[in-house]
């Protein structure tokens, strides 16, 4: 059967107009775990909530967010959550 994440991804794509597809097109280097993080940030989850969902430590989440910013080439003043919410 499909894993929970695959189902989540499909539903999320429907609601958020191909969010994952467009992200992957624009940023081909994003991994499946990057995409998970992107989705949770778009839903405005806190680092604490994300840590729980992804089974990471808070520091692990902070590190993942940092790597994600690098991949998206965001500079210091760009907010990751705002970027995800506004991404089309």
Each model region followed by its residue ranges:
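Cytosolic nucleotide-binding catalytic cores of signal-transduction proteins
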Residues: 1-88
